[in-house]
A protein has these predicted regions:
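Non-catalytic alpha-helical scaffold/packing segments enriched in small hydrophobic residues
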Residues: 14-21, 53-57
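CBM-like carbohydrate-recognition segments
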Residues: 43-56, 61-62, 67-138
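Flexible, active-site-adjacent loop/turn segments at secondary-structure boundaries
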Residues: 12, 30-34, 99-100, 117-119
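Single conserved hydrophobic/aromatic residue that forms the stacking wall/gate
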Residues: 1-12
Length: 138
């Protein structure tokens, strides 16, 4: 068996615990606030880059984690995150947003760096998540 999960049961189990914690702490639309421990106010920034990374990870983890219920919940959140990221709120119009795909990412708010901006890695993980999702449908 050359499966990536061979001998990694404990690793995937721990990753499942982390994923479950994230599911409990995400807002209804799946786009996290810039910090899970930040006070939530109307002006609290959302982080599209974190959502894109999570969506990609939820899809990948769903391929290896045992249990149908966990797989379904990870995929459901990934789908929700991808749909929200593809909405007008987060998806930039072509030729805008410095030609980046996603809007509203946060790099380092405490340093006042990369706040509510497009980020290269947000686009990368968004595209990776879309590709992983497409490949699941095959």
């Amino acid at each position: 068996d050359r499966s990536p999960s061979r001998g990694l049961g404990d690793v995937y189990k721990r990753q499942g615990h982390i994923a479950d914690m994230l599911l409990r702490r995400l807002p209804a639309d799946g786009i996290p606030y810039w910090d899970f421990d930040a006070p939530i106010e109307e002006q609290t920034y959302r982080d599209a880059s974190a959502a894109a990374i999570m969506a990609s990870a939820f899809i990948e983890l769903s391929r290896y984690i045992p249990g149908t219920e966990a797989k379904e919940s990870y995929l459901a959140m990934a789908e929700k995150q991808l749909r929200t990221l593809a909405s007008k709120e987060y998806l930039a119009e072509p030729g805008t947003n410095e030609c980046f795909i996603l809007k509203h990412s946060v790099g380092a708010l405490p340093d006042k760096s990369e706040v509510d901006v497009p980020l290269t890695y947000a686009d990368y993980y968004f595209l990776e998540a879309l590709l992983r999702y497409k490949n699941l449908q095959k």
